[in-house]
């Protein structure tokens, strides 16, 4: 509901960053008829192009069709890296056969290092961070993110100069404190068996879990 109501005639490309490596966003977009720009080109063995991710309008028809530009800086379960070659494939048999070569950043002590040294991961992160440039005028939606990733937290905190909407069941105290200090940050969250909203630096108790994206879409988009 949220995706179909957000991609509109006014903005044909919506930018999404996810630290998750599942394909839920891609599947939902397919069902909604929304194209997904991943930075990879090709059908069976997709190859990564930074310019395709950076300048999608040079390749895709972004005037007549709706698109999601998807940044996956921790990799994806359909990315394969083998013998120095990297490609994207949606062929289940290939993914099953090459399971040990699936390219994702798993939780652990080497997480930050891998994200810095892998070229595709680094490009994904750098291009998304560029979108967070404080000089640009836009609003930012953060959904279900726990602010536990050093790669993005600094850039996200800098972007808090803009209008920011945070939907997350669990929110760290320092994020809540920032919302109480800055009127441009709105937060919906759950704490101590209650639902809360922080809006224009004031905290309210509410009667429904608006941090849930479906509840949010039903309430504000319909």
What would you call each of these model-derived segments?
Residues 8-11, 56, 107, 111-115, ...:
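A near-ubiquitous, low-amplitude feature marking generic local secondary-structure context
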Residues 1, 104, 216-220:
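Generic hydrophobic, helix-prone segments enriched in Leu/Val/Ile
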Residues 3, 61, 93, 102, ...:
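Compositionally biased, intrinsically disordered low-complexity regions enriched in proline and serine
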Residues 6-106:
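Extended, H/D-rich, highly charged conserved domains that either
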Residues 114-116, 122, 126-222:
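SIR2/sirtuin-family catalytic core signature
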Residues 84-134:
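Flexible internal linker/loop segments at domain or repeat junctions
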